[in-house]
């Protein structure tokens, strides 16, 4: 709803040099065309302050349906929104987030065609971002600020074979940051809004100093939750240093640090939010249903006698865990990258990216006395060194680890062929711990007693060693009117998990070692794009994809048997085949694209949800749904009519997506999606927009037993700034954004797929941003 144009994108060599992308995104180094062929693409026929060039808008020359959110569109986005919300305006993407900012990691869902968030590959400036799990993953929204993004380029069904990912079953989304500037300067912006939102952003540029250029930026976001007590606190730092040896050779270092913490808010059945739309955790410890003293249960003071001098648990009722204070999420992540590009010969280009990601963090959920007591009793009987629960326990989940890798490739232009080949290697480790600790007085407001563990649940390390190889040849024929791409890749992932998987390993089996090797050495991709005339193209593609099973840690940490004597069968790797056929046009007042798609899956894993008795919130588990399929179409376009003096333009996307498994529609997969908007630019200093989003009816589960109603949402913005006759400096701008303009209430906006637990749509939310560029 925040972006006006829904676009495709062609990654050119200039863009690769500008952005330093060593992701081996397809550079468009075509053979020389005749003058008439070149002239066809020199004119941009639809223009505006928030309109990109036509080749970006419609994915010119791409053999797959490639769409993008561009920098022009990002200029109108609300300050501080999640990187996932930038996908809302792209055709086919069903994005549901919690709150206007969308920063709550356990309230995000994305589906495109039949894929979900964990089956989409993400790449940032050539760095593969691994999996999108909140626990142990590398969700893209931790690593971007929209002020630094140049484009977000998505292939909804068939990403290029050169793009590195072990998670993708087809879709790839590349986030590309802006390059360093040749001129010194910077920008400062400040945002204020509802829910006590305050956000600052500052960026400083050195300019080009004898080939060396750099920038650094920092944003700080503080806000209350829109529903209930609790806050959001995010500090985000980005930096980039680039040295250019010549026009084709550079080295670039990038750094991102994200320090984030927020509080949970509850999900619930639809009936809960119909009764109380703002249902939330409590801002004080309740007395009713909470306070009930139990004496003589444990020798807390260690004098070998249980008597009146020992502590007596007081906070033993079930309602004690409805207090908000012990429901927090903390993440501290850093990403380092080093990009290098050079031309070995005039026709042979080498690119490489080395990277390291360090992850640390924890989450906390309170655990009730009764739930802790039952597990404590089991672990005492097993001889574990645990302490009787004191009341409400501190439910600590620790997450941490690192990823190190390198991506490298060569591109060789010979005659009418562009040959690309390369490799990716990554070594990832992830540490997960879970235990329940006592607190002073057994109160959620008490201090953590770090040497009193009420029970243990998990303590394991999982590793992923990934190797991907690829080879691709793009042949230009018929005087560059026909381009045919033939590619193949291989993927191998060695997965292992070592340690205490779950309760049974502590109580019965002891630490375990499990794992599996996932590999497919032949994953082909074939695509073609043909120029029908000066304005129209058709394209088609076919690809096979293979991925590490989603939720691998959750699956391999099932501890129902002793893995050394009775190992559980390992899940199979997920497989998919994707077919696309499409058309794009670029005319004087309109450009657009249309694509038909068909996708089939084998060994598709779908997420179900069960209610955790400790937290009373959904917890994911995974089911092999076997074979599934999806088919439909995606339409997108922009219309700027001449009779309105090119001051008004209309944009829209329409998606039909039928995704099913065993005859049942997949959960959280609406068949119809629509986004559209109207933008008005009467002067150089004013841009106004109103946008709408329609999400069709869908199901909460995989058996079509719980349907969710469709809903619509309007958003708007007004952007003031630029050349004017009022004496206001042209480098100063003021933007107003409104989300959920009509203040719609939708109790089932977000669903934990496979359950009937929901999160409601945020109310109307307003913010204003003042920006100064210098």
What role is predicted for each listed range?
Residues 8-11, 15-16, 30-31, 256, ...:
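Conserved C-terminal beta-signal and adjacent last beta-strands/turns
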Residues 43-78, 109, 154:
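N-terminal periplasmic "start-of-domain" segments of outer-membrane beta-barrel proteins
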Residues 84-128:
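Extracytoplasmic beta-strand/coil segments of soluble accessory domains associated
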Residues 110, 127-156, 176, 272-273, ...:
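Short acidic/polar hinge/loop motifs at secondary-structure boundaries
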Residues 143-189:
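A beta-strand signature from Gram-negative outer-membrane beta-barrel systems
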Residues 185-187, 192-222, 227-304, 328-349, ...:
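Transmembrane beta-barrel wall of Gram-negative outer-membrane proteins
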Residues 339-355, 359-363, 531, 537-543, ...:
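Membrane-embedded beta-barrel scaffold of Gram-negative outer-membrane proteins
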Residues 415-416, 477-484, 589-591, 595-610, ...:
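Gram-negative outer-membrane beta-barrel transporters
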